[in-house]
Each structure stands twice: as C-alpha cells, then as structure tokens.
C-alpha cells in the first residue's frame, strides 16, 4: 500500500524522508536541528525539511549556543537540489515566514513565544500540504510531521481536527486510523479527536473490525508474522454483562467474532477490561491493542514515554510516535504538542522526532 523507495535509483538506496518543520513558533525547528545533528541518520536515510529557512536558521543559532551543535542550512526549491550531507540541513523553503511580520518582534529577536497565530497556522498547514504533495508524486518516500497547533490552523481557516484528518482528506482516504507506539507498546484507535460522548457513539462493529484489520496489517508490515491483538473494552469491567453498558455485547464482540473467523489472532476472543489490557501489553502478551477512544490509548503511552523533571520544570524524555494507518503514503509523527511556552530556548527534547524518523525509515524499507 505504501509507495516506498521511489527515487532511490539516483544516488543510493536510502529512502528520502520529508520532515515538516511544524509550527514555526513551536518546538519543531529546534528538535529538527537536534535530530539531524545525529550524522549516523544520514547512513540510513536522506532527510529534507519542509518549512522556512528563517525559523530553521534561528533554531540552528540557538543549538550552536546552547548545545554546541554546528549545522548549516541549505535552502532548496526542489527535492532534487538537496545535498543530503551530514552537517548540512536541506530545507525545502516555502518562504512563508518573515520575522518582521510578527507584531512587536524586531528582526533581531527570536521568532518564538507567539503562541497560536494565523501566521503560524497558515505556515504549518502549508508545510503539511507540500509534504503530502511530494509523497503523492513519489518525490519523497515517507513523511514525518512535527507538531502544529489545531487552534492555529483553524484560526488560519483550515478546519481540521489534526494531521490525521488532513492526510486522509488530501489523499482521499476513507478508512484510516491512528496508531501510537512506544518501543514495542502499540495502540490503534477506533476514534480520536471527538468528544467522549461522540466517541462512545462511534464504537460500532464495522469500525472496530476495520481498525482490527489495520492494526493486524501494520504489525505484519513491521515483520510480526502472526500478531497478537488485544481489544480494550469501552465500559468499566467491559460492561459487566450489560450492567454498565452494552457496547461490548452489541458492537465489540461481534467485530471480534468476525475477525477470529478470518484467522486474526485475538488470544482472549473477547474484549479485555481497559484497566488490565495495558499491563498485559506491557508484559509482552500483545503486539498491539485496539482502543476505543483517544485518551484510552494516549494516556498509557505517554505515562510510559514521557518523563517530567519537576525540579527543572521540563521533560527529560518525550518518546513515542504517531502513525496514520490506511494511507497510500507513509506518515509518522511526533507524539507531543508544539511546546510554545519553552520554544526557542534550545531545551526541547528530540527523542520523539528521532523515533518517528527511525520508524519511517523502517516502513520505507519494507
């Protein structure tokens, strides 16, 4: 389904990874600098950043001062002009960000700390639009996205609830879902960016079965021959035989039964209570868990992947990735937000982006 290794006949067999810069006023530019400062990455892929030279140059200056990272920015207007050399960050420069456009921010001051803005929303949306276009034209083998602000893109007139929905719309994909992963702990979502009330209404047999299929296929793509899939219930104690809700009986179990008839490996043959399914997954019993709504999957992943330092008031670790399943192109993302409050200080943690690039490489080489 994915279209990988399409330009790899000119230069070598390393996949070209298009990385969006994210919101120019967020943490995307600086974690991109830190990720691409690992020169070993260039032994496995050819990265190109989709964004604006102005923000990337500032982030490079900060990285040099704070972390002693010395990288050059190479603006290009075509993928074919990229150098793909360690120490040089190729930026597909859309030229959307002019620092002087920001009210009260002189040219010499950092272009950060603005928070959600029309300018940041418009720019970050256009980066995503461009990288999707490049992937659909097979000019890049995979896409990796830094964070944008949902509020900011909507302020700019782009009415989407997140990257996943943008990708689905622009690739004309009807059936898709979000998968989160932290190392070997993985979850696939039946619903994501909707209210909890609506999320309950979306737990239907057809949708649950659809996500089971996508989860099963995703695990096979990364080399797991017979994936073991856990299915989280929706209600406390999986509804206790209908006492606390009937979704397990009426929707989830019928989906599981059909999946079992198709030969999909669901060890229990039934939904597992949400308060125990993740402990079993962390113990290695499942390769992936199908969850019923956003926070049911996000909370356990972030409890494992995020480590907060209360003394220093920053994140010591921000690990985990977001993958959109069901698309005709590869899309992997960081699993955190824009970090407006600390953006530009050079302290943002790049682990999630590094993980995302690694996973994109793995999918590209499939």
What kind of feature is each model-predicted range?
Residues 2-163, 208-230, 234-322, 328-366:
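Contiguous, glycine/small-aliphatic-enriched amphipathic segments in soluble metabolic enzymes
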Residues 158-186, 192-195:
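Flexible loop/hinge segments that line or gate small-molecule binding clefts
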Residues 165-174, 196-220:
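Active-site glycine-rich loop that binds ribose-phosphate moieties when present
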Residues 180-181, 322-324:
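Well-ordered beta-strand positions
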Residues 190, 325:
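Substrate-binding rim/cap in mid-to-C-terminal beta-strand-loop elements of soluble/periplasmic
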């Amino acid at each position: 389904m994915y279209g990988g290794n399409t330009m790899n006949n000119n230069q070598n067999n390393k996949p070209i990874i298009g990385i969006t810069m994210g919101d120019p006023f967020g943490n995307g530019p600086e974690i991109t600098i830190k990720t691409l400062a690992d020169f070993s990455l260039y032994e496995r892929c050819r990265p190109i950043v989709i964004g604006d030279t102005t923000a990337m140059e500032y982030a490079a200056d900060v990285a040099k001062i704070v972390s002693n990272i010395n990288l050059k920015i190479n603006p290009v207007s075509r993928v074919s002009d990229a150098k793909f050399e360690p120490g040089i960050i190729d930026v597909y420069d859309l030229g959307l960000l002019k620092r002087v456009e920001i009210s009260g921010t002189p040219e010499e001051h950092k272009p950060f700390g603005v928070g959600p803005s029309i300018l940041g929303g418009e720019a970050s949306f256009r980066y995503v639009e461009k990288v999707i276009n490049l992937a659909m034209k097979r000019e890049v083998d995979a896409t990796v996205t830094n964070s944008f602000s949902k509020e900011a893109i909507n302020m700019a007139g782009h009415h989407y609830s997140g990257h996943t929905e943008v990708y689905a719309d622009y690739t004309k994909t009807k059936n898709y879902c979000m998968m989160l992963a932290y190392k070997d702990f993985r979850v696939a979502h039946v619903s994501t960016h909707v209210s909890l009330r609506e999320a309950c209404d979306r737990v239907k047999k057809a949708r649950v079965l659809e996500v089971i299929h996508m989860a099963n296929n995703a695990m096979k793509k990364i080399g797991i021959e017979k994936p073991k899939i856990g299915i989280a219930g929706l209600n406390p104690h999986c509804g206790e035989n209908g006492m606390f809700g009937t979704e397990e009986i009426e929707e989830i179990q019928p989906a599981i039964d059909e999946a079992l008839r198709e030969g999909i490996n669901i060890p229990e043959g039934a939904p597992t209570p949400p308060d125990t399914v993740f402990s079993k997954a962390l113990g290695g019993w499942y390769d992936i868990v199908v969850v019923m709504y956003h926070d049911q999957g996000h909370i356990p992943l972030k409890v494992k992947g995020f480590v907060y330092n209360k003394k220093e008031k920053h994140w010591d670790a921000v690990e985990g990735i977001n993958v959109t399943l069901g698309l005709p192109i590869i899309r992997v993302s960081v699993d955190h937000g824009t970090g407006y409050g600390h953006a530009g200080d050079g302290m943002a943690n790049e682990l999630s982006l590094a993980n995302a690039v690694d996973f994109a490489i793995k999918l590209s080489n499939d």
